[in-house]
Structures are given as C-alpha cells and as structure tokens.
C-alpha cells in the first residue's frame, strides 16, 4: 500500500516536470512579447533583447554624449504680464516642466515677471487666487489633455537690437580701457628723477596766497563811491585782518556776508 502511493506521487511529479519542460520550449521563430510601461501608448511595447541585423550597439553614456554635442539655446529675458486683476498671481509652464509656480510682482494695476526663456515655443498658465486661468488677450493653444494654455514664441530676431546694443557697449568699454591703460606719449629713459634739496624740504607758505588780496589795500576807482568797496572773494570772508600800527593806533577789519550784501567792519583801538 505504501509503495503504491509513493509511485503515484513520483509519477505526478515527473509529469509536472515534463509539462513545464514542454511549456518552456519555443517553436522556431516564435517569441513572447513583453509589455513595458503604460498600456495607453502602444509605442512603449518592446521585445526582449533581440537585435535586428544592422542594429548599432549603444553604450549607456551615448545619449548623454549626444545631448552634450547639441548646442545649448540661449535664454532670453521675456516679460510676462497679467492685467486681469487679482491679489496673488503665479505662473507656471512648459519652460519649467510645470513643476513650480513663479510669483509675479505687482506693478500699478498689473502683475509682471521677467523670465529667462530659451528660444522656441512655450506653453504657460496663470495661477490667480487659487485658480488656474489663461489670459484671453494672448495667443492660446489646446494641450493634449484638452486644457487651454497661453502660448509664447521666443524668437532670436526679437532681441537683435538688444544684442547689437550689448555688443556696442562691450566694444566701447574695451576701447575706453585700452585708452586708459595706454602710456602717455613722450620719450622714456632709464634715468630716475632726482629731487633737489629745496624741493624736498620746501615747506608750505605761512599764509595762503589768496588771503593776501585784501580789499582794504586796493585803490578805489574814482568813478565809484569811496564808501563802497569792491565785492570780495568768498575766501576773504570771516577772516580778521590787522593794519600795521601807526600813531599808537591798531586797526582791525573783518568782512561778513548777509544774504546778498557784504559788510566790512573796521575797529580802531588806541594802544
């Protein structure tokens, strides 16, 4: 009895192994398809590692190498404006993969943002007070999901004037730098300038030269009133002048300004 049961179990196991062996084999020219990714897009279905004749071998870094060979598009400063009101306005679009909302700055009655966008077409939308809306006054496009977005086309030709002005500014700055860095004209030699002793130890004057022009020492014109003095220089104001002592009398003078008039006061003091 025990031997019969053992043989039956052994036979069932052997049959299962044979069935698995038959199921694991493939007919000539037949392969199972393996679906990878989303089933919404039939283009993502792929076969196992089967290579057709003439296929190229790609190394893992070849895609990065191809991307590095492509020239990078220059970013252009683009003004985005929202004029439909609101308290808080943000913007998001295909230029940042709709990942973040960029705030707009309020300027008078509008909201403005200056974004550095690469050349080409970009879709964008505004987030105003918690709702996604588009600007009806700007070009629009319907996305693949059926939503209406604004469309902007950044072209290089729109910035040719700014590029020309920038190039002209750079050239003018380089020219001015060359002019400043150039040496003054004239002969050059190897001899060092030697200071003379009187130049080295020259001391400043006791009295500044412009204070030597005292209006009381000047002669008065005959055609002028002798009580009127010529208009003094501004450096002569608020200084005290003294006349040489004669006949035991000292004379002091000072000139002051009151609005548009000048008053010279003389003080006589006996000694």
UniProtKB/Swiss-Prot annotation:
GO terms for biological process: cellular response to nutrient levels; fatty acid biosynthetic process; positive regulation of cold-induced thermogenesis. The modification Phosphothreonine is found at residues 39, 147. This is 5'-AMP-activated protein kinase subunit beta-2. The lineage of its organism: Eukaryota, Metazoa, Chordata, Craniata, Vertebrata. Belongs to the 5'-AMP-activated protein kinase beta subunit family. Non-catalytic subunit of AMP-activated protein kinase (AMPK), an energy sensor protein kinase that plays a key role in regulating cellular energy metabolism. In response to reduction of intracellular ATP levels, AMPK activates energy-producing pathways and inhibits energy-consuming processes: inhibits protein, carbohydrate and lipid biosynthesis, as well as cell growth and proliferation. AMPK acts via direct phosphorylation of metabolic enzymes, and by longer-term effects via phosphorylation of transcription regulators. AMPK is a heterotrimer of an alpha catalytic subunit (PRKAA1 or PRKAA2), a beta (PRKAB1 or PRKAB2) and a gamma non-catalytic subunits (PRKAG1, PRKAG2 or PRKAG3). Keywords: Fatty acid biosynthesis, Fatty acid metabolism, Lipid biosynthesis, Lipid metabolism, Phosphoprotein. The keyword Electron transport does not apply.
């Amino acid at each position: 009895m025990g031997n019969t049961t053992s043989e039956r179990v052994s036979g069932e196991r052997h049959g299962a192994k044979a069935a698995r062996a038959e199921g694991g084999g493939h007919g000539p020219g037949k392969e199972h398809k393996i679906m990878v990714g989303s089933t919404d897009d039939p283009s993502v279905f792929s076969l196992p590692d089967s290579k057709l004749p003439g296929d190229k071998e790609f190394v893992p870094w070849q895609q990065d190498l191809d991307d590095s060979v492509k020239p990078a598009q220059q970013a252009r400063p683009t003004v985005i404006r929202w004029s439909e009101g609101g308290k808080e306005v943000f913007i998001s679009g295909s230029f940042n993969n709709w990942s973040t909302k960029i705030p707009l700055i309020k300027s008078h009655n509008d909201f403005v943002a200056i974004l550095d966008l690469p050349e080409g077409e970009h879709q964008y939308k505004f987030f105003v007070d918690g709702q996604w809306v588009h600007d009806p006054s700007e070009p629009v496009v319907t996305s693949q999901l059926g939503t209406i977005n604004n469309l902007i086309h950044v072209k290089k030709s729109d910035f040719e004037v700014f590029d020309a002005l920038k190039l002209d500014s750079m050239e003018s700055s380089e020219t001015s730098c060359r002019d400043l860095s150039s040496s003054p004209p004239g002969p050059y030699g190897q001899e060092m300038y030697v200071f003379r002793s009187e130049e080295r130890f020259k001391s400043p004057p006791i009295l500044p030269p412009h204070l030597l022009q005292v209006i009381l020492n000047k002669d008065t014109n005959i055609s002028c009133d002798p009580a009127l003095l010529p208009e003094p220089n501004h450096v002569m104001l608020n200084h005290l002048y003294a006349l040489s002592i004669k006949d035991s009398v000292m004379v002091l003078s000072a000139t002051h300004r009151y609005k548009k008039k000048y008053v010279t006061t003389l003080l006589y003091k006996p000694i």
